[in-house]
C-alpha cells in the first residue's frame, strides 16, 4: 500500500505499508494507525481485488471496515508503464520528475532496483524478462516484485488517466 500526496500535479509517495503474509483486515488496521489516515480521500485497488475467492472481495472488506470505496479498472501492463514513465521523466520547465519517493519507502524503491528488497536483502527489482545473454525477451516485464509499482500505476491512471503519445510530426521524404 502506497500513501501519496498530489500537489500541483506532482506525485509524492511519502509512506507505505509493504508487508508479506498479512490479510486485508491486518493491512487496514496498519493503515488506520498511521497519522495520515484521517486525511485519506480515495484509494485504488487491482481489479482482482474486486473478485470473490471463497471470501469477501478485498475491496468489499475495505468498504465495510473503513467506509472507503476503492476504485479499480483494468490497466494493461504497457499502458501502465507508459503512464509511470511520464512521471519519471524530468519536467523540462521544473527541472525534476513529477514523481518523488520518500527514501523510507524501501519496498517500492526495491521494486525500482534502488535498494535491496526489505524482506530478503537481495536485489529483486521489477524488470523485463532476459535471456542468458542479457537480452530482453518478450513484450512484457516479469510479473513479480511489482506490487508497489502496480499500486502506484493504478493510482496514477485513476487520477491522471492513461498516457498517450503526443502528436508526432510527419516528415515527408522524397524518394528518388
Where are these regions (language model features)?
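Short beta-strand motif preference
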Residues: 1-3
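Charge-patterned, long linear interaction tracts outside catalytic cores
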Residues: 135-176
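Mg2+-dependent endonuclease catalytic cores in nucleic-acid-processing enzymes, primarily RNase H-like
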Residues: 5-137, 162-163, 173-176
